[in-house]
């Protein structure tokens, strides 16, 4: 299964397809096309159930993408409150800064996300 199929399934919340792909010995922490890991795509697209699954399979909660953006920053930038909550509960480093030099709290526009990050 290629990166495009996996990325589509991650972005669209097709958990059954992601499980099917990962059963075939896919590395949950591998870097996909575009320099991001599966967890980044799930966080960026607000796929909370997908995040839970990937984390249960050993996804690195603090893995940076090719730009130095973590899954927590991805979820924060896109305003996905539930994803931010899950990532924090699973040990995401809320003090890591993105390439713009801002932490998740500093980058957050959502008051609900800021409250979680305090």
UniProtKB/Swiss-Prot annotation:
GO terms for biological process: regulation of barbed-end actin filament capping. It is found in: Cytoplasm; Nucleus; Cytoplasm, Perinuclear region. It holds the Pfam family Ank_2. Keywords: ANK repeat, Cytoplasm, Nucleus, Repeat. The keyword Amino-acid biosynthesis does not apply. Gene3D superfamilies: Ankyrin repeat-containing domain. One of its GO terms (cellular component) is cytoplasm. ANK repeats lie at residues 1-30, 34-65, 67-98. Belongs to the myotrophin family. PANTHER family: ANKYRIN REPEAT DOMAIN-CONTAINING PROTEIN 39-RELATED, BRCA1-ASSOCIATED RING DOMAIN PROTEIN 1. Regulates NF-kappa-B transcription factor activity. Promotes growth of cardiomyocytes, but not cardiomyocyte proliferation. Promotes cardiac muscle hypertrophy. Plays a role in the regulation of the growth of actin filaments. Inhibits the activity of the F-actin-capping protein complex. This is Myotrophin. The gene is mtpn.
């Amino acid at each position: 299964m290629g990166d495009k199929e996996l990325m589509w399934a991650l972005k669209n919340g097709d958990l059954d397809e992601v499980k099917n792909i990962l059963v075939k010995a896919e590395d949950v922490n591998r870097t996909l096309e575009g320099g991001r890991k599966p967890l980044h795509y799930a966080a960026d697209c607000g796929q909370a159930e997908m995040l839970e699954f990937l984390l249960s399979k050993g996804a690195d909660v603090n893995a940076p993408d090719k730009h130095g953006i973590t899954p927590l920053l991805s979820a924060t930038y896109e305003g996905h409150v539930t994803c931010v909550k899950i990532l924090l509960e699973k040990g995401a480093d809320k003090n890591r800064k993105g390439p713009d030099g801002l932490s998740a709290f500093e980058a957050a526009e959502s008051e609900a996300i800021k409250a979680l990050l305090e």
